[in-house]
Amino acid sequence: MAYELEFEKPLVELRKKISELKEFTKHRDVDFSDEINKLEARLEKLENDIYANLSPWDRVQIARHPNRPTTLDYIERLFTNFFECHGDRCFGDDEAIVGGIAKYHGLPVTVIGHQRGKDTKENIRRNFGMPHPEGYRKALRLMKQAEKFGRPIICFIDTKGAYPGKAAEERGQSEAIARNLFEMAGLTVPVVCVVIGEGGSGGALALGVGNYVHMLENSTYSVISPEGAAAILWKDASLAKKAAETMKITAKDLKQLGVIDEIIPEVRGGAHRNVDEQAKYIDDVLKRSLRELLPLHAEQLIAQRYEKYKKIGDFVESQQHVSVM
């Protein structure tokens, strides 16, 4: 059964009517082609209206869609000869992060990303895409290996956040995230990051220090979930929709604020509607990003990355004179 989002219910009802009429026409000697054509035209108009006016909360729902493509879905479509590497060489192998070496249009690269499950069993195995410290240390190990061999790094970001459990804290969750931020800032190879779903807090940032950071059109990137923000601000997690409106978590907002570099368009209705087509959109942006970064020397890459993050958070003070009575 198809998973339907809250704002898509009018579309689901209309599609159901069209399907019923087609089925009735197929088994009865009755022609409903005019009615079907009218309903299909109405459906197309309604789809255009809905998807052209998505609210931040609508985009949160799309980013969390259970069928939304994962890192491994994109690896399968964008890379060849992918060889997954395991373990952080300190504690264990965290399956909430996948990474390895691959070829991207013939170019050797290292690709790393958060990985959610496709069903309950896999989600439990991958901890719902929320990494432990060993996941971030595995990612850093692969990044330093990529630096050693001169391979560009491509990171896919999709997590609610780093796992906040007791064991993760005991093994140094905050240190692992901080270490990744520090080390990624100084990598001497090109780093391109793409937010493909949810970009949650430090758990996302630990894979997000790149020369370019891009976001899929319906992905989100924030310091906290809308539910968490609502619980803190208004003591009521049910006000998540209100929080989403004010948090500036969408790709459009973050592009305007200079946090990300480019918005990658999604197929209408969300990336889950056509993964192959969505991969092509990502491919176009990755190719262009690497084409711009590959000619740069190590010092230039580090300087460009430094300037990018130095500008985030800039503000302009108002010059308006205010008289005090």
Curated annotation (Swiss-Prot):
Residue ranges occupied by any CoA carboxyltransferase C-terminal domain in the UniProt entry: 35-292
Top-level EC class as recorded in UniProt: transferase
Self-association and partners: Acetyl-CoA carboxylase is a heterohexamer composed of biotin carboxyl carrier protein (AccB), biotin carboxylase (AccC) and two subunits each of ACCase subunit alpha (AccA) and ACCase subunit beta (AccD).
UniProt similarity note: Belongs to the AccA family.
Annotated keywords: ATP-binding, Cytoplasm, Fatty acid biosynthesis, Fatty acid metabolism, Lipid biosynthesis, Lipid metabolism, Nucleotide-binding, Transferase
GO cellular component, one term: acetyl-CoA carboxylase complex
Keyword Cell division: no
Pathway: Lipid metabolism; malonyl-CoA biosynthesis; malonyl-CoA from acetyl-CoA: step 1/1
Protein name: Acetyl-coenzyme A carboxylase carboxyl transferase subunit alpha
PANTHER family: ACETYL-COENZYME A CARBOXYLASE CARBOXYL TRANSFERASE SUBUNIT ALPHA, ACETYL-COENZYME A CARBOXYLASE CARBOXYL TRANSFERASE SUBUNIT ALPHA, CHLOROPLASTIC
PROSITE patterns registered for this protein in UniProt: COA_CT_CTER
Catalytic activity: N(6)-carboxybiotinyl-L-lysyl-[protein] + acetyl-CoA = N(6)-biotinyl-L-lysyl-[protein] + malonyl-CoA
EC number(s) from the headed UniProt entry: 2.1.3.15
Compartments where located: Cytoplasm
Main location (coarse class): cytoplasm
Function per UniProt: Component of the acetyl coenzyme A carboxylase (ACC) complex. First, biotin carboxylase catalyzes the carboxylation of biotin on its carrier protein (BCCP) and then the CO(2) group is transferred by the carboxyltransferase to acetyl-CoA to form malonyl-CoA.
One Pfam family here: ACCA
Protein origin, superkingdom: Bacteria
Designated gene of the protein: accA
Molecular function terms from GO: acetyl-CoA carboxylase activity; ATP binding; carboxyl- or carbamoyltransferase activity
Any one GO BP annotation for this protein: fatty acid biosynthetic process
